């Protein structure tokens, strides 16, 4: 189901509206071969091993090597090296009173089992999955030199329909799609979730009062704050990198325009002007500019607004519809929703310009959101007539679907790194 912003653009510009376990759908051959030895046979040990394997698979940087003895046994580093593993993770789980002790080692199988990393943790039973993600982060950073993204989270909108009624919920889950928790539930639409830079709050659009309003909500406490409630459109909130401002879309003066809201004082400043529709603002990571979607050129395209002098320049020229654009955190690429021949796919363009390359090809993809390490793009798509979430690498060489939930899942947003 395409979101309302897309539908609005299509209606205004064309007069029409176009309407689990991790599943790897495409991989790469250059991934680092790694073996995950069993952490033990009990439920906690098996969950830790499964989560680590899932995490490293999601990253697109690793190829999992299976041992000869099955999932619940440990093999020697030399044996796993013979099977093709360059690195081996081995762990153990023990019960210590009412706590769980988890230890792991990362060995270099190429260098005769040289220990690269070894750590021990004590946790409560409800922290098993979180610790597994942390171990994945440790392994990933040790072997790649980059910070892992497995302890980050994702937000999305879940829609369940029963007869003529719909139930909307703003949910937060682990980066692998597991452990979902509902922050908000409503019989009216919820849209456009966006994480604050510190990962503690999410801004969103609610229609609970039969009109659009922008709120923020605390991820920890659920406490809400009303940001805007003007007549007409209140939409597409996006946080500034310092977390002190929200860029929003308001139609209180007529045509939808982009405004800046100071979250401390509540004061507002209009950023775009003219008669065209301007929407979907996204700050650059350095805070110097905004990307936004506008019809000022005749069709929805991506533009850049310099916050220093207000100058606007067009970014996209390829295709008849480009929208929902955002920079990757490293500012090397711009990821966007790209339409050609009535097919909606996720596209990527170098920040300096050039052609747009498709990362996905289903024709029903939307709402791209980039991981904090700039390597992966989370997006919404359709699979077996349901809304699901997919992940694609920034080079398009690895694609996968996240665990399916009941109902339709849409409008995902990837959190920043969480402390």
Curated annotation (Swiss-Prot):
Subcellular location: Periplasm
A Gene Ontology biological process term: cell division
UniProt keywords, alphabetically: Cell cycle, Cell division, Periplasm, Signal
Keyword Cell cycle part of the UniProt annotation: yes
Source species, domain of life: Bacteria
InterPro entries: 6-blade_b-propeller_TolB-like (IPR011042), PD40 (IPR011659), Tol-Pal_TolB (IPR014167), TolB_N (IPR007195)
Gene Ontology annotations for the cellular component aspect, listed alphabetically: periplasmic space
Family membership: Belongs to the TolB family.
PANTHER family xref list: PROTEIN TOLB (PTHR36842:SF1), PROTEIN TOLB HOMOLOG (PTHR36842)
HAMAP family associated with the record: TolB
Subunit structure, as described in the record: The Tol-Pal system is composed of five core proteins: the inner membrane proteins TolA, TolQ and TolR, the periplasmic protein TolB and the outer membrane protein Pal. They form a network linking the inner and outer membranes and the peptidoglycan layer.
Function: Part of the Tol-Pal system, which plays a role in outer membrane invagination during cell division and is important for maintaining outer membrane integrity.
Name of this chain's protein: Tol-Pal system protein TolB
Provenance organism: Legionella pneumophila (strain Corby)
Gene: tolB
